[in-house]
């Protein structure tokens, strides 16, 4: 059987890092098993769901190098949900209820006051037809009837054996009074219809899983394998759209590389060290869903920021060729020169400026004679990365300066700054004429 997973965001906001982690782990899991990946938009909330959010979610996943085999919108499947809803209603596994929100709140408070679990008391099931007729003017909503005699259990790939006493679970609302569906039933119907075999999601869905297992059973369908990830926390707050967790837009504002983000989320929550990679496919080979632990996982944006230069340092020219072409850079020499010295990709713009012909050299008065001498012994012939070694040897024959007192004045004269990448790689980029101009510069 082909493994099939799904990532099911609600297009009611931008992706936050908790979503991204779930999507990545789900994607890595199925790709590591040569499976298929469904992108499902849970947009049954027609008022809050927006096309702009849906497009941004898809674009963010592409930016993170995740692809999908097909996608679906729940809003296109209401007829199918109605079909299954009516079947379960006929089978008396779904039943109508008539309480107002205020009445339900009052019942819940009374149960808590009496020390009882705050679950629905099923009073709607005890109504006579006459009583139902009395409520005919009320808005009706519907619940799925839990089999409360069951012990609901499953083998979770992260949490091991998980069990719920169904007697302590409230019958979930599956259809609201306004006729819209809640998350529960459409999700199960989609998982059945699209042959979902494995579901990866946050531990905040564990109680939903217990309920949905009964829905799978009620529809005589195979129950998928579940993996419940520990939640991400930032400053002791659970990350969510409502808390205001970092979105991909925030990460892009920080100019973080996609693979800094992916390398981080592929390993936090496991005991494995975080190793940076430049391609998402490289993360597939070491992926193991069982390595994720149950402890709360702390997210720290500073840790991702620290990974960013490491990713850039490992990127080859081919990895950034398209982005460099947008800056009119077509030769690999400049990237080879600066890649080990940038914190974010945009830093290269400063090095383009430095390597251009408008840079003003810095030659201290105390170094002027030294720079003149250095220019006089600059090697003839083709300039390559060996030129620097020869040049330094020539200089050392003419001066008793220590290496530091040689390198810093030369760097200032050639770049205008006191730190930076290897000068050996800079010389071929500048060329003889520009080197002579800079070393011979006078105010």
Swiss-Prot record:
GO terms of biological process kind: glutamyl-tRNA aminoacylation
Role, per record: Catalyzes the attachment of glutamate to tRNA(Glu) in a two-step reaction: glutamate is first activated by ATP to form Glu-AMP and then transferred to the acceptor end of tRNA(Glu).
Keyword field contains Repeat: no
Protein name: Glutamate--tRNA ligase 1
Assembly: Monomer.
Gene Ontology MF annotations: ATP binding; glutamate-tRNA ligase activity; tRNA binding
GO cellular component, one term: cytoplasm
UniProt-listed SUPFAM superfamilies: An anticodon-binding domain of class I aminoacyl-tRNA synthetases, Nucleotidylyl transferase
Cross-referenced NCBIfam families: gltX_bact (TIGR00464)
Sequence motif: 'HIGH' region, positions: 9-19
Motif segment ('KMSKS' region): 238-242
Membership in a protein family: Belongs to the class-I aminoacyl-tRNA synthetase family. Glutamate--tRNA ligase type 1 subfamily.
Binding site for ATP: 241
Encoding gene (name): gltX1
Subcellular localization, as worded in the UniProt entry: Cytoplasm
This enzyme's EC code(s): 6.1.1.17
PROSITE patterns cross-referenced by the UniProt entry: AA_TRNA_LIGASE_I (PS00178)
Catalytic activity field: tRNA(Glu) + L-glutamate + ATP = L-glutamyl-tRNA(Glu) + AMP + diphosphate
Matching HAMAP family: Glu_tRNA_synth_type1
Keyword annotations: Aminoacyl-tRNA synthetase, ATP-binding, Cytoplasm, Ligase, Nucleotide-binding, Protein biosynthesis
Main localization, broad class: cytoplasm
A Pfam family recorded for this sequence: Anticodon_2
């Amino acid at each position: 059987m082909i493994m099939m997973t799904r990532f099911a965001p609600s297009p009611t906001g931008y992706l936050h890092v908790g979503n991204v982690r779930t999507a990545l782990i789900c994607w890595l899991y199925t790709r590591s098993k040569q499976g298929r990946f469904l992108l499902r938009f849970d947009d049954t909330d027609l008022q809050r769901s927006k096309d702009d959010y849906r497009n941004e979610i898809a674009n963010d996943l592409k930016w993170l190098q995740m692809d999908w085999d097909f996608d679906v919108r729940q809003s296109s499947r209401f007829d199918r949900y109605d079909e299954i809803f009516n079947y379960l209603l006929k089978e008396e596994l779904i039943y109508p209820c008539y309480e107002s929100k205020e009445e339900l709140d009052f019942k819940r408070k009374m149960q808590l006051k009496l020390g009882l679990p705050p679950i629905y008391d099923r009073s709607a099931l005890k109504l006579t037809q006459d009583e139902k007729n009395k409520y005919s003017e009320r808005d009706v909503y519907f619940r799925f009837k839990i089999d409360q005699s069951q012990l609901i259990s499953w083998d979770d790939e992260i949490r091991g054996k998980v069990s719920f006493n169904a007697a302590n679970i409230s019958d979930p609302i599956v259809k609201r009074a306004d006729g819209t569906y809640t998350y529960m039933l459409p999700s199960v119907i989609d998982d059945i219809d699209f042959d979902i075999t494995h579901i990866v999601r946050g531990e905040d869905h564990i109680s939903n899983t217990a309920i949905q297992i009964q829905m799978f059973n009620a529809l005589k369908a195979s129950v998928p394998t579940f993996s419940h990830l520990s939640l991400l926390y930032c400053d002791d707050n659970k990350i969510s759209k409502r808390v205001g967790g970092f979105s991909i837009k925030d990460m892009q504002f920080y100019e973080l590389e996609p693979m800094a983000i992916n390398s981080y989320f592929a390993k936090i929550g496991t005991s494995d060290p975080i190793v940076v990679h430049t391609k998402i496919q490289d993360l597939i080979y070491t992926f193991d869903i069982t390595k994720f632990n149950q402890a709360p996982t702390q997210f720290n944006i500073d840790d991702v920021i620290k990974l960013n230069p490491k990713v850039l340092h490992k990127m080859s020219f081919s990895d950034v060729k398209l982005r460099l072409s947008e800056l009119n850079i077509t030769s690999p020499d400049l990237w080879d020169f600066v890649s080990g010295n940038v914190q974010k990709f945009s830093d290269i713009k400063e090095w383009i400026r430095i390597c251009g012909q408008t840079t003003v050299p810095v030659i201290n008065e105390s170094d002027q004679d030294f720079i003149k001498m250095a220019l006089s012994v600059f090697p003839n012939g083709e300039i390559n990365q060996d030129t620097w070694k020869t040049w330094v040897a020539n200089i050392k024959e003419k001066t008793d300066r220590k290496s530091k007192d040689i390198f810093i004045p030369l760097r200032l004269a050639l770049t205008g700054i006191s730190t930076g990448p290897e000068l050996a790689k800079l010389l071929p980029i500048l060329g003889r004429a520009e080197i002579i101009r800079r070393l011979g510069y006078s105010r």
